[in-house]
A protein has these predicted regions:
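Short pre-active-site segment immediately N-terminal to the catalytic Zn-binding motif
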Residues: 197-217
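Post-HExxH zinc-binding segment in Zn-dependent metallohydrolases
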Residues: 226-281, 287-295
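Pan-zinc metallopeptidase signature
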Residues: 38, 275-393, 399, 410-421
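Active-site recognition of the HExxH zinc-binding catalytic motif
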Residues: 211-231
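Short cysteine-rich clusters marking metal-coordination/redox-active sites
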Residues: 33-36, 47-50, 89, 111-114
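Cys/His-rich microdomains that often coordinate metals
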Residues: 37-40, 54, 93-96, 102, ...
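Auxiliary, metal-adjacent structural segments of Zn-dependent hydrolase domains
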Residues: 126, 130-196
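Residues immediately within or flanking Cys/His clusters that coordinate Zn2+
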Residues: 30, 44, 83-86, 92-95, ...
């Protein structure tokens, strides 16, 4: 990340490392099998009721049922594309880690989501294939949410300056650790985070209420969008008024945080202890939390969840789509009663609170700022005219430094993509 400010005297480069993001939610609307009307999930590849083939069609934003048409093509049964031919992504048909579809005449072997993955784990280790599946699943959920918010994603070959790519790496045998983080448009995830037992050990050791794979993706995407939406833009000075000076020395802040910890009063000003470390991390934590709120409200609305508050003046959950919500205040009014209900349901199940957070007024102001930035970016993107089709995203997939097969079944030279310091 670069600090584009003449006050700094020089650009300050850093690779963000984030050991403790921790949020997960289902941002999906309800999907159904077009053959039998059974409800299906975003990740399903077959209907559990009638065994029909399923796949997600990005241009429809729908799960479609399919008949196998032969020659590697499938015929859609979805009313909006009935009879149209598609192909499963290579990572769907061969690697079993995806369920997205491409038009039959698309020459690309990979879907628009898988094309963003630059490096995959070494598949000679069978556990890594399962971790890869989980990583791709979380990544697709992130991409779904960003698309719903109107935020564009380009691969580096389509946008060398602002493109986004992912690397999924494992620790080396010589003790060198892969640090989850973001640097220069590349998000690196340590595949160990896809191991539930490892992630829970880390969560406990770091005293975190949540630690999820999807949360890592959300947080690191915040760093990526900071570079795209804040650095060097009209938002930089307003950002500093809300979050602080982004030109503060990151390495010193990191060292101070791990030496001294967070201030005792951090819940009054920050969404998490880690957010106190540096304005970059405060932004990324707040960004991730905003995505969580939008995802959960989107899901609740899509499933027809309605709350009947006990008092006439208490906020209610309105039947509106969160990503189209113009009023941030209304968004928050819908959010708080839902969290009360969610936590009450969890307690009735004998489980910990599903939403163990308290949003102080200062935190709500930061969320409001994220909302303003995203809304403005979405409006700007919607107003642009482009000749480039949205499914033209492309990238080259390699393997990690320990070898293995890439998404095309080949074994090209690997690249090392550690993002950290």
């Amino acid at each position: 990340m670069q600090c584009a400010d003449s006050r700094c005297g020089a650009t300050v480069a850093r690779a963000t490392t984030h050991p403790n993001d921790r949020r997960q939610a289902d941002p999906m609307k309800p999907f159904h099998c077009n053959r039998c009307e059974q409800r299906v999930y975003f990740e399903n590849v077959r209907c559990e009721s009638c065994d029909t083939l399923l796949g997600y069609v990005p241009e429809l934003d729908e799960i479609s049922a399919f008949d196998d048409a032969g020659d590697g093509t499938w015929r859609s049964l979805h009313p909006a594309a009935e009879g149209k031919l598609y192909r499963p992504c290579h990572n769907y048909a061969v690697e079993n880690v995806c369920n997205w579809m491409l038009p039959a005449d698309d020459p690309a072997p990979l879907c628009r989501a898988c094309r963003l993955t630059r490096t995959i784990p070494n598949l000679s280790n069978q556990d890594n294939r399962f971790y890869w599946y989980r990583l791709e699943t979380a990544k697709r959920r992130l991409l779904y949410t960003l698309a719903e918010l109107g935020l564009s994603i380009e691969a580096p070959d389509a946008d060398p300056e602002h493109g986004l790519e992912f690397e999924f790496l494992e620790d080396s045998g010589n003790g060198e650790r892969v640090m989850t983080g973001h640097a220069n448009g590349k998000i690196t995830l340590n595949i160990a985070e896809a191991d539930d037992a490892h992630r829970e050990r880390m969560r406990t050791a770091m005293g975190e209420p949540y630690r999820t794979l999807l949360g890592h993706f959300r947080h690191e995407s915040g760093h990526y969008y900071f570079e795209r939406l804040i650095t060097g833009t009209r938002w930089q000075e307003p950002f500093r008024q809300v979050f602080g000076d982004d030109c503060a020395d990151y390495a010193q802040a990191l060292d101070a945080y791990y030496r001294n910890g967070a201030p005792a009063d951090w819940p009054q000003r920050y969404i998490s202890a880690y957010a106190t470390m540096h304005p970059w991390e405060d932004w990324a934590e707040t960004w991730a939390h905003y995505l969580l709120i939008v995802d959960v409200l989107d899901t609740a609305t899509s499933y027809g969840v309605a709350l009947l508050p006990p008092g006439p003046n208490d906020p209610a959950l309105l039947d509106q789509t969160p990503v189209e919500e113009a009023s941030f205040d209304n968004l928050m009014k819908r959010w708080f009663p839902l969290t009360y209900a969610l936590n009450s349901l969890n307690r009735s199940l004998g489980m910990a609170d599903g939403y163990p957070f308290t949003l102080a007024p200062a935190v709500v102001d930061k969320l409001r700022f994220v909302h303003r930035v995203i809304s403005a970016a979405a409006r700007e993107a919607a107003g642009k005219q482009t000749s480039r089709a949205t499914d033209g995203i492309g990238a080259v997939t390699t393997v990690d430094t320990t070898g293995g097969a890439d998404a095309k079944g080949k074994a090209p030279p690997a690249t090392d993509g550690h993002a950290g310091s």
